[in-house]
């Protein structure tokens, strides 16, 4: 078996360079969309971000949007079974943000709920919130 590089992308529009220290936390595919969490990019007034890509018929990815994670160090996220809500688990701020998702366009909306889970963590300490899942 061999692998062939097909595309190189950054998580930002026009393939802009990521801020030094930014890390990808999690990657998920839902339908024709790929989502990734961007840890430590502070793209939204100190909050980190999620990136959405659209998968073309030939398999290439096109940047679609960056949206706020509504906290810092988005370690994990989960899309509900219906595909219309996303739970974002921000590790360092120990919060779960719920945002709507359009199942047709894949676009994420503005936060509709937020819950703090335990004490906030310390950046780079790997403490705080570590996982979110929908119990459906």
Label every model-predicted segment:
Residues 1-136:
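Feature marking well-ordered beta-strand scaffolds used for ligand recognition
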